[in-house]
């Protein structure tokens, strides 16, 4: 697995964990938990690739990985829509800024996972 991809993903998670949204912090903590889950999933795929040493062998051996990856993309799309919705309904400008930052980070996470998935295809 590309070490730059791993460190970039970890940086995104670190920045997300440092965000404080006041009354919305519970929502953010739930999102961070889901980000951690996505990171663990992505890392487990990377470890499987390293153990196998052959992407084609991994693909033929594990026919469910595409379905799992699709589910993770659905999860992150849902998170993006949830943040967009919260951004629209929030009237506090400080929280709006934080949700805009969260949205930007979510889009970065989606890009990281997409990049990694293309490595598996």
Curated annotation (Swiss-Prot):
Q: Name one GO cellular component term.
A: host cell nucleus
Under the heading InterPro entries, the entry gives: Flu_NS2
Its GO biological process annotations read:
exit of virus from host cell nucleus through nuclear pore
Q: Where in the cell is it found?
A: Virion; Host nucleus
Put simply, this protein is called Nuclear export protein
What keywords sit in the KW lines?
Answer: Host nucleus, Host-virus interaction, Transport, Virion
Q: Where is this motif: Nuclear export signal?
A: 12-21, 85-94
Q: Does the keyword Cytoplasm apply?
A: no
Signal sequence span is none
Q: Which family does it belong to?
A: Belongs to the influenza viruses NEP family.
Question: What species does this protein belong to?
Answer: Influenza A virus (strain A/Seal/Massachusetts/133/1982 H4N5)
Transport listed as a keyword: yes
Main localization category = virion
Q: What does this protein do?
A: Mediates the nuclear export of encapsidated genomic RNAs (ribonucleoproteins, RNPs). Acts as an adapter between viral RNPs complexes and the nuclear export machinery of the cell. Possesses no intrinsic RNA-binding activity, but includes a C-terminal M1-binding domain. This domain is believed to allow recognition of RNPs bound to the protein M1.
Complex formation: Interacts with protein M1. May interact with host nucleoporin RAB/HRB and exportin XPO1/CRM1.
Further details from the record = Average number present in a viral particle is estimated to be 130-200 molecules.
